[in-house]
Regions:
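Residue-level detector of short, conserved catalytic/binding motifs and their immediate flanks
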Residues: 45, 74, 95, 174, ...
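An amphipathic alpha-helix/helix-turn recognition signal
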Residues: 71, 92, 200, 328-329
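Fold-level signature of zinc-dependent metallopeptidase catalytic domains
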Residues: 3-5, 121-302
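Active-site-adjacent bridging/hinge elements
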Residues: 177, 304-311
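Short pre-active-site segment immediately N-terminal to the catalytic Zn-binding motif
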Residues: 310-333
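N-terminal prosegments of processed precursors
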Residues: 1-124
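Short, hydrophobic/proline-enriched secondary-structure or compact coil segments at domain edges
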Residues: 95-100, 271-278, 308-313
Length: 333
């Protein structure tokens, strides 16, 4: 899927496979050169990207990350434009990426579907018509915890003195446990592809922390499958994962479907747990939701707040049957 030699550019449009128009998005089949990315590791190195319009962009190397499953991530930036990053994760069976275009232009996306890589381009004009509350919400995607959380749940164990990443010294490493639904993995083609996708999303998060100079690094300690439906409300799923009934504002037993995941939080000493599932519109109600400890001006009390170290994230695209339009959850959402 990324076996082109280094011919001086990251990708080439694949021959013999037609592009596909899906709503506001054009999917173009491409062939990738992982060799080009490997040759672009190191200060002063660049990845050259040639778009389907023939225009070239050059991205300067910022950092790279190697993952336990053998996948790895390259991060570069348009010269002189902080926040305009290209982030590409190469795995054994999949490649995922986000390619900055500068200014207000929407990022291009690299994704893997049906065993091959695709470049996804958004039509900015059509994209403006796709604003919908679950993918571009006006309300916050953070939830405030109920008061007086039960104690004794797996807790926050933020680490001091984490490893150093380029551009900022990390002072806190947050260990993350990821539970992914079977639908999420099947939609990508399998467990290997799901793991590559998870690694990519974590590195998108890490780059956001670097850009914001928070001194925080996210680290995956384990990823595992969970047997839970995708086409349900993210808010209800967060309640079921946490052990909360938000409608009645009471604590309840967590859904048994998450028993193994919650136990793994203790086993792997995870600070935070997220459930990653395939985006379903409009059933998910959003692209994700999490508890906001300390929200509303309340004090942060680790012994209490550890109970709320959970989040739910939707990933991918789906057609909303109510308007027959295709919606995406952004990598950085």
């Amino acid at each position: 899927h990324a076996g082109l030699p280094d011919n001086g550019t990251l990708l080439a449009v694949a021959k013999g496979v037609r592009s596909q128009k899906r709503g506001a998005y054009l999917w173009s089949p491409v062939e990738l050169s992982e060799a080009h990315a490997l040759d672009a590791i190191g200060p002063g190195q660049h990845i050259v990207f040639t778009g389907t319009d023939g225009l070239q962009h050059s991205f300067e190397y910022q950092r790279h990350a190697e993952h336990e499953d053998g996948s790895w991530t390259w991060v570069g930036r348009l010269p002189g434009e902080p926040g305009q990053e290209t982030i590409i994760t190469f795995g054994d069976r999949a490649v995922f990426g986000s390619i900055a275009q500068g200014g207000d232009a929407p990022n291009l996306r690299l994704t893997t579907r049906d065993g091959r890589p695709w470049l996804v381009e958004a039509d900015a004009g059509e994209l403006a018509t796709l604003a919908k509350w679950f993918t571009d919400p006006e309300e916050s995607d953070a939830r405030l915890p109920l008061p007086h959380a039960p104690r004794g749940a797996a807790g926050m164990r933020a680490k001091a003195g984490g490893q150093i990443l380029p551009e900022a010294q990390t002072s806190t490493t947050i260990d993350v446990l990821v539970g992914f639904t079977s639908g999420f993995a099947q939609g990508l083609g399998g467990t290997s592809q799901a793991q590559t996708r998870i690694n990519h999303l974590i590195e998108v998060g890490n780059q956001a922390h670097l850009n914001a100079e928070t001194g925080v690094q996210l680290r995956i300690v384990h990823a595992m499958s969970v047997n839970y439906a995708d086409a349900t409300s993210n808010n209800k799923t967060l309640d079921a994962l946490t052990g909360v009934d938000s409608d009645r504002k009471v604590y309840v037993d967590p859904d048994p479907a998450f028993a193994d995941l919650r136990a793994a939080r203790e086993t792997y000493k995870a600070d935070l747990v997220t459930v990653l599932r395939k985006f379903n519109a409009p059933e998910n109600d959003s692209c994700g939701v999490a508890w906001l400890n300390g929200g509303g001006g309340t004090a942060i009390i680790p012994e209490d707040d550890e109970f709320y170290g959970y989040s739910v994230v939707s990933d991918g695209s789906d057609v909303d049957e109510s308007d027959d339009k295709t919606y995406f959850c952004r990598d950085e959402a």
